[in-house]
Amino acid sequence: MEPGKLTPIRRSNAAALVPRERILIAAARLFRERGYRATTVRDIGREVGIQSGSLFHHFASKEQMLVEMLREAAISLCAGAQARIASSSDPVERLRVLIRFEMECFVGSQTRDYFAVLVSEWRDVPAAIQPELQWHRTRYSEITRDVMEDCLAIGKLRLPPDAAERVLHGITNGAVSWFKSHGRYSVSEFSDIVASLLLAEG
């Protein structure tokens, strides 16, 4: 399924009681903390301070909330990565930029919980959207692998590209559970540490 064929996100014309994105951000946080199945529409309404029934002015169901946050995470991950690495032709700098971008998505952005849910709630993704999300997962893997292979070609990668890719994604996915924005490391500092694990010296 190509990007041009993606189903557009439908925006409700109903009067907004609270911003739509605020509801999604709250829902994503609850999905990450409690799990999608354990979170109720009432929980989400309570989190944003409105009656659960009012949520249906914005979303047809809890499943639609899940679909929209996953779609946004998947699309922005691919599009953002491509845009960031296009700023440099140097393989090492491109990898550093990619690492920083991935860290920002998973632990530094306002929608970081979208990405956490993308990882943790895959089993609950509706069948209709799975091919779309899988296309983006594959595309992001290709982007990452290409950057890794370019670094290897100039002798700057410590690991085989497939192993380096898994290390990177494993670190960023794991950071979701422990990284604190006001903790010991900033996103930039921790990104540099990850880069030092993957890039050869000299």
Predicted regions and their residues:
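C-terminal peripheral helix-coil segments that are non-catalytic and often amphipathic
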Residues: 1-7, 97, 101-105, 141-150, ...
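N-terminal intrinsically disordered/low-complexity leader segments
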Residues: 1-18, 29
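Hydrophobic alpha-helical connector segments
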Residues: 68, 82-110, 165-168
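Amphipathic alpha-helical packing segments from all-alpha helical-bundle domains
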Residues: 75-78, 117, 127-154, 162-166, ...
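Amphipathic alpha-helical segments used for helix-helix packing
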Residues: 107-128, 145, 177
